[in-house]
Amino acid sequence: GSFKYAWVLDKLKAERERGITIDIALWKFETAKYYVTIIDAPGHRDFIKNMITGTSQADCAVLIVAAGTGEFEAGISKNGQTREHALLAFTLGVKQLIVGVNKMDSTEPPFSENRYEEIKKEVSSYIKKIGYNPVAVAFVPISGWHGDNMLEPSSNMRWLKGWKVERINGNGEGKCGSXALDAILPPPRPTDQALRLPLPDVYKIGGIGTVPVGRLETGILKPGTVVVFAPANITTEVKSVEMHHEALTEAVPGDNVGFNVKNVSVKELRRGYVAGDSKANPPKGAENFTAQVIVLNHPGQISNGYTPVLDCHTAHIACKFAEIKXKVDRRSGKSTEDNPKAIKSGDAAIVILQPSKPLCVESFQEFPPLGRFAVRDMRQTVAVGVIKSVVFKDATGRKVTKAAEKATKGKK
């Protein structure tokens, strides 16, 4: 029934009266093909941080541009939100994009085809500069206020022939918004890669013992796996794996699981640790890492020695900007100035970062979810980045439990 989508309409109504989208929320609904989780990316300067936290988990970005007179122009202007959001999504590795041309009811005249075409042309040229390919992007005219063209074609826009996308791995076409969501390509779930499972929490459960939980990002986890927790280097055997209170014979990427480990106390593990397979490309702590960062909204200058908090996967750790190596062009990544004294809002740079405490990260190329981060300071996100390379620590001073030794011996 239509009430399932009432949130989107009610929310847009309330916010239209207030005039602005601010809070971040996780909304879930279903289309014919997918369970969709919407991570709201609010269109207001101070709230870009809300977007970043969610964007690291997104498979597709939906960029909403307002068609109202003057409103679209403000969003796409030199320092408008539309530009910033699209650039952030691309930088953080969200390669699929849908553009919703909203508030079609407030164009002059209402539901104007010319206005839609004008916006489509302008946004296409902008997203192309960022790195998106406009022919692979669905442009969908909608009115959230009245629900036009969101679930089914609208009688107010009879002129609409529909949207088309052309992609190497599958074309798509349709008219309304929900069909554009159905045309998203499901992300590859990397089961053939090494196991990486960042921990958001660790529980102690009576009669069972220590149960770390988290979402598998890559690889496979099953009972009997001898896991290592980086950066602490604790090795132990997995006794059982559960999802939604059911035992699994194996967990795959995307699964949110709890798994029981032997001979490790809950005090030894913490949020931000990463579980991997001790025998197959195991995770390690980082000595330092090189990243490309984009400064979003820092009131002053950032120079060598600056030590904000980095949010990377489930870890929150202070890291020092040990060396700002070069300023680079935001789009091409080419160097424009070597060893700059400082960087400021709007700049992109290659920097070497040094964690103040043990931290496990990976290059974006190899493990995307462990290779992108937000830089936080003064209760806001001041920069975002992707990791280009990591200098790993030597795995010394580690704890290997008896269960791990036994499991390892038995498998020789």
UniProtKB/Swiss-Prot annotation:
Keywords: Cytoplasm, Elongation factor, GTP-binding, Nucleotide-binding, Phosphoprotein, Protein biosynthesis
One Pfam family linked to the record: GTP-eEF1A_C
Modified-residue entries (5-glutamyl glycerylphosphorylethanolamine), positions: E250, E323
Family matches, as CDD domains: EF1_alpha, EF1_alpha_II, EF1_alpha_III
One GO CC term, this protein: cytoplasm
Gene3D superfamilies, per the entry: P-loop containing nucleotide triphosphate hydrolases, Translation factors
Ligand binding (GTP): D40, A41, P42, G43, H44, N102, K103, M104, D105
Domain tr-type G: 1-191
InterPro entries, alphabetized: EFTu-like_2 (IPR004161), G_TR_CS (IPR031157), GTP-eEF1A_C (IPR054696), P-loop_NTPase (IPR027417), T_Tr_GTP-bd_dom (IPR000795), TRAFAC_GTPase_members (IPR050100), Transl_B-barrel_sf (IPR009000), Transl_elong_EF1A/Init_IF2_C (IPR009001)
UniProt family annotation: Belongs to the TRAFAC class translation factor GTPase superfamily. Classic translation factor GTPase family. EF-Tu/EF-1A subfamily.
NCBIfam families in the cross-refs: EF-1_alpha, PRK12317.1
Name this protein carries in UniProt: Elongation factor 1-alpha
Record organism: Rhynchosciara americana (Fungus gnat)
High-level lineage: Eukaryota, Metazoa, Ecdysozoa, Arthropoda, Hexapoda
